[in-house]
Each structure stands twice: as C-alpha cells, then as structure tokens.
C-alpha cells in the first residue's frame, strides 16, 4: 500500500467533516483533516460572531483584520458557516449538513452540547453512521472546562518550566491542546 501525505490526501478527498469545536484542540483536529484532503466545514456560533479566537490578536496584528493569526493557525483549509444551533431554522441547516457528513468534531461541555443538540443520542438519530470525535478534558467532571494552562498546572508541566517554585511559568505553546488534537485525529483515522 502506498504511503505518504499525497496518498492520504487523495484517500480523504471524499470525506466530509463538520466541526463545531472552538479555541485550539478541536479546530486543530479539523485542520489536520483539511490538510489530508477532507472537506471540512467549521460551524461557528452566529450569536458570538464566530469562534472567539477570531479576535485574539497580538498588538502587532492589524486590528481591522477579520481574523487573528491564532485563528488562522488552526482553521486553514476550512469552509466556515455562522449558525445559531439554538435556533430551529439554523438547527435544520446543521442537521441537513450532518445527514451527509462522515465525521463531527466537537469539544463542548455536556450542558452546552445538550442546548446545541449535540448529544450522542440526538446525533445518532440524525446520522446513525456519523463518526463523532469529542475532546473532553475531565471525564469524571463533564462540566469542568479544560483549558491548556489548567492542564499544564495539573500535570506538573508548569513546575518544570519556571525558574524555581516561586516563579512558575506556563509553557510558551499550548502543548496539552496540541497533544489532545493529535490523539483524537489518530483515533479517528483508525
């Protein structure tokens, strides 16, 4: 069997991935699939004006730009749709996309997933064959958000990057998010 990125890119050309994830880990998974040739549609929160990271700009970035470098770094190659999944009209549009999708990537807290109609039970009724990749930081605490810096602290990484115990420092890269994204991508590819 041939290997390499061009082979995978060709293999995934017919794959439709829908992504509702935000920030870094979930969107990175979607971008990995876009890089491999899949068609990825990122659904952004219409109420919020899109993914919050669109506005996470450095002082060196053009304030008039519609997107930040941060947003661009994990959303390459995707199509974007603004939908309010709490609205019946937009939920119908979303469900129509899901009926033809192969995969859905999410990273919402359990209560938010319920409000947005993204529970596994409901998704099974919309598309029984849908592969659902979900990033969750704390399996035993479904309502606890898992931001990278929190996980760096809980895993001890912060204690390894500071100068001493009184001067702890966050790693300059969101390593936990990056690792989570790669793990989910690999799991979905299997």
Regions inferred by a protein language model and the residue ranges of each:
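N-terminal helix-loop segment corresponding to the beta1-alpha1 unit
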Residues: 2-190
